[in-house]
Amino acid sequence: MASRSLSYTQLLGLLSFILLLVTTTTMAVRVGVILHKPSAPTLPVFREAPAFRNGDQCGTREADQIHIAMTLDTNYLRGTMAAVLSLLQHSTCPENLSFHFLSLPHFENDLFTSIKSTFPYLNFKIYQFDPNLVRSKISKSIRQALDQPLNYARIYLADIIPSSVDRIIYLDSDLVVVDDIEKLWHVEMEGKVVAAPEYCHANFTHYFTRTFWSDPVLVKVLEGKRPCYFNTGVMVVDVNKWRKGMYTQKVEEWMTIQKQKRIYHLGSLPPFLLIFAGDIKAVNHRWNQHGLGGDNFEGRCRTLHPGPISLLHWSGKGKPWLRLDSRKPCIVDHLWAPYDLYRSSRHSLEE
């Protein structure tokens, strides 16, 4: 009886120990899930780009640097890599290009590794953009991609980059540059805050809602202004004037009104038009051949506008890498393809 009782007691003890172990392990896993940082998505793999070096005529001073800002959206990274390659390839002084990348928190280490392995000689820095700055201010627009926090990062650019930078070129990720970016960098701003290709005689009724046009106070904002549209995906910004004029706060004010009254549909663009329309330094249209991604609903193919081209921009729903992968490219997408550094599984097998 004693031996049976002992065995029974040992069995109960063993079961209790196992139950405690399982419970403790489960709790540890649960706590771990709660405390763990958001994991970065699996990033595409890219081929290493060639090294691009300065010509003999290039300066080496800080004043010779050309500052370029872009966002690092993991969904658009393939486009960003192509854009960077195009900038380097067509630059007379590629080592003078200084890149300022804005990314969401938690992803910067993976993105840094991806850029460094693709462009080992690139002069760049990654800055964290806090999505909470805009998340509560974003209103739903006509396309989900326009509602992402990084789409609004350009508004806070002057507050994020170093104070020593007094001019910067902001570029979207769905474009390629086929000219020397130094030409755009040296544009004479003539006292303006923003320089960009400008399209006047625009029909502003398409950009704002009936609520806007029926409000006599809001409509006054556009009184006396030339009805000129510009695409915010390609801008030269006088950062000092932006800071002094407190333009970040001015854009935020319009976003707050939008949240209350729903006065426009197109994401981050309309606030820029309300503030800067007709009051920017106009740049030659060759620096933004935009709309190559088609409209915001179907992304149908479009042809090039007549005239010289320095920059091709796939604004709109259709992106060249997606259309090429689906084997349903538009003709203009083949102009983007030579800059694609994406290493597909097929290419990996061939190597």
From Swiss-Prot:
Locations listed in the record: Golgi apparatus membrane
Question: Ranges in the Lumenal compartment?
Answer: 30-351
Q: Which domain of life is it from?
A: Eukaryota
* Pathway terms, separated by semicolons: Glycan metabolism; pectin biosynthesis
Which residues face the membrane's Cytoplasmic side? 1-8
Mostly located where? Golgi
- A GO molecular function for this record? polygalacturonate 4-alpha-galacturonosyltransferase activity
What does the record list as GO biological process? cell wall organization; pectin biosynthetic process
Return the InterPro entries for the record. Answer: Glyco_trans_8, Glycosyltrans_8_dom-fam, Nucleotide-diphossugar_trans
GO CC list: Golgi membrane; pollen tube
List where the protein spans the membrane.
Answer: 9-29
Give the Pfam families listed for this entry. Answer: Glyco_transf_8
Query: Topology in the membrane?
Result: Single-pass type II membrane protein
* Residue positions the entry lists as glycosylated: N96, N203
Q: What does this protein do?
A: May be involved in pectin and/or xylans biosynthesis in cell walls.
Q: Which family does it belong to?
A: Belongs to the glycosyltransferase 8 family.
Q: What is this protein called?
A: Probable galacturonosyltransferase-like 4
Q: Which organism is it from?
A: Arabidopsis thaliana
Q: Which gene encodes it?
A: GATL4
